[in-house]
Amino acid sequence: MLQQWLRQSPAAAGLLRCSRYRGPQAALLQLSPQRAPTYHAIRSLQTSAAESQERIPLRKQLKQGAKGLKAQKRQRRESEEASRQTWELTVGIEIHAQLNTETKLFSRASTSSTDTPNSNVALFDLAFPGSQPEFQAATLLPALRAAIALNCDIQPISRFDRKHYFYQDQPAGYQITQYYEPFARNGYIDLFKHDGIAPEDGDHVRIGIKQVQLEQDTAKSQEYPPSTQLLDFNRVSHPLIEIITMPQIHTPATAAACVRKIQSVLQSCSAVTTGMELGGLRADVNVSIRRRDEAPGTHQYGGIGGLGQRTEIKNLSSFKAVEDAIIAEKNRQIAVLESGGVIEGETRGWTIGSTETRKLRGKEGEVDYRYMPDPDLPPLYIGEDLVSGLRQALPTPPDELIELLAGSDYGLPIEDAKPLIELDDGARLEYYQDVVEILRSLQQDQDAKSRTILARVAGNWVLHEFGGLWTKADLAWDAHRVPPQTLAQIIDQLQRKRITGATAKQVLVMIFDGDRRSLPQLLEEENLLLRPLSREEYIALAETAMSQNPQMVEQIRSKNQLGKLGWFVGQMMRMGEKGRVEAQKADEILRELILGQSGSQP
């Protein structure tokens, strides 16, 4: 390598020459006579044979890496299991969700998040002296929908309080909330295995909801290090609900599942417009630890006693962050207690990708915030007729929809039913149901089993084939791009074996990309209709494929290695005219010729 470098660099070659070579460890470089001779030992530029032999192929490196990760996961599971036997984790969650409203909570300013910073601001939002709050009654409706969907008791009378603290994102020096008398209490949310709860929690967990309260959001801060911070007051006084769960969660995975499920419920009843992924929902988690073999702790929350000292981790913005932050804080508290330390009640932060929480400040209590009734706002009265009307107008809850889709009428696996419900605020589910209804009308005289099969086929196309095109194009969902009628017709043609699966996918892509020809016209003009092969043509293809590998034919005959039939089917499909060879019929002919099994003749 040195010689090559010297050849490519004549100037360097003129300055340097090797005085003499004594092996890799004694290589010396000497300056030319024009300069004073100075000698420096340098590292060998050669690669020894032993080093070259140690190079590991990439595939082997990947395998070793995968094994290492698997071993780490196994060790982590074993460590967590041992930890669970000794320590009890308790978690409570506070979820802050931006409501789906056009105006702010106490002013008529718009809640649009896309406008120019500081353009949607009323005098009260900036706490101008003399400005007064004007409660916007319309903001109550999505809050009520959320509380009803979370099985809460709506309170006929609720009141607003001031929570005092000073920070730059809250110009009034206090936040208006409902600390003492919230508008909703005593709710619950049910979590099931398919929601992602931890295996040790069984098949079902019910988490109590202590209360749901209305409150203001704060300004949006943007930091520009080292010393600049900009504030956008468009978000000040945006209506929020704070959902406070009971401390009844005992595993990190179930905590994340709880936040995910609550977001799904809020979206299903149009209480919110965005979720965690766009900043419309944030979570704070309260974490405490106690030894199982010791007396119950001295702390209590929400009427549940015997808890350890809790810490709060603020502003978690993803489901994974919820789970990871709880794991990190649990491990920190266990380490502190095992070393003889004491857990301090404090507020902590979490950074994505970190393995540790960090202290932000000491934990404030009720006295620190100086809660007091807001003298500028009257009590909030909620009539039973309003609650009853909203309850009747709510859409079907997600759990009931999953039960419907996984039932005998649709027969979808739960892993397909869940995304259909959650994607595109229910628009994907509505599209799917339209496709199924049209497809069933096209495929008349179907028995119950056949109707279920059609629904499952349609689910695969809507969620995976059609859904994959949207994911690849990175576009917002639009049902008009491929209307339900068109997709149902494509599936109908496939079910009637007038087109192949490959052709069906090709046609779907063409229509998705903007081809506006009717389906019959497109199939005819592009020569995509399946022209079935005769029995003789299938036999000719099969015999040709068999002649190419008689040894494999004998293995199928003598050793009953039926899995190798697939190779011959593939050969027949490659040899035949594109799209004309049907795999099922090819398999039937091969079984007849090789094994003497008679099937339905094509």
Curated annotation (Swiss-Prot):
<dbReference type="InterPro" id="IPR017958">
    <property type="entry name" value="Gln-tRNA_amidoTrfase_suB_CS"/>
</dbReference>
<comment type="function">
    <text>Allows the formation of correctly charged Gln-tRNA(Gln) through the transamidation of misacylated Glu-tRNA(Gln) in the mitochondria. The reaction takes place in the presence of glutamine and ATP through an activated gamma-phospho-Glu-tRNA(Gln).</text>
</comment>
<dbReference type="InterPro" id="IPR006075">
    <property type="entry name" value="Asn/Gln-tRNA_Trfase_suB/E_cat"/>
</dbReference>
<dbReference type="Pfam" id="PF02637">
    <property type="entry name" value="GatB_Yqey"/>
</dbReference>
<dbReference type="GO" id="GO:0032543">
    <property type="term" value="P:mitochondrial translation"/>
</dbReference>
<keyword id="KW-0648">Protein biosynthesis</keyword>
<dbReference type="GO" id="GO:0050567">
    <property type="term" value="F:glutaminyl-tRNA synthase (glutamine-hydrolyzing) activity"/>
</dbReference>
<dbReference type="InterPro" id="IPR003789">
    <property type="entry name" value="Asn/Gln_tRNA_amidoTrase-B-like"/>
</dbReference>
<dbReference type="InterPro" id="IPR023168">
    <property type="entry name" value="GatB_Yqey_C_2"/>
</dbReference>
<dbReference type="Pfam" id="PF02934">
    <property type="entry name" value="GatB_N"/>
</dbReference>
<dbReference type="InterPro" id="IPR017959">
    <property type="entry name" value="Asn/Gln-tRNA_amidoTrfase_suB/E"/>
</dbReference>
<dbReference type="GO" id="GO:0070681">
    <property type="term" value="P:glutaminyl-tRNAGln biosynthesis via transamidation"/>
</dbReference>
<keyword id="KW-0496">Mitochondrion</keyword>
<feature type="transit peptide" description="Mitochondrion">
    <location>
        <begin position="1"/>
        <end position="52"/>
    </location>
</feature>
<keyword id="KW-0547">Nucleotide-binding</keyword>
<keyword id="KW-0809">Transit peptide</keyword>
<keyword id="KW-0436">Ligase</keyword>
<dbReference type="InterPro" id="IPR004413">
    <property type="entry name" value="GatB"/>
</dbReference>
<comment type="similarity">
    <text>Belongs to the GatB/GatE family. GatB subfamily.</text>
</comment>
<keyword id="KW-0067">ATP-binding</keyword>
<dbReference type="GO" id="GO:0005524">
    <property type="term" value="F:ATP binding"/>
</dbReference>
<comment type="subunit">
    <text>Subunit of the heterotrimeric GatCAB amidotransferase (AdT) complex, composed of A, B and C subunits.</text>
</comment>
<dbReference type="GO" id="GO:0005739">
    <property type="term" value="C:mitochondrion"/>
</dbReference>
<dbReference type="InterPro" id="IPR018027">
    <property type="entry name" value="Asn/Gln_amidotransferase"/>
</dbReference>
<protein>
    <recommendedName>
        <fullName>Glutamyl-tRNA(Gln) amidotransferase subunit B, mitochondrial</fullName>
        <ecNumber>6.3.5.-</ecNumber>
    </recommendedName>
</protein>
<dbReference type="InterPro" id="IPR014746">
    <property type="entry name" value="Gln_synth/guanido_kin_cat_dom"/>
</dbReference>
<dbReference type="GO" id="GO:0030956">
    <property type="term" value="C:glutamyl-tRNA(Gln) amidotransferase complex"/>
</dbReference>
<feature type="region of interest" description="Disordered">
    <location>
        <begin position="61"/>
        <end position="83"/>
    </location>
</feature>
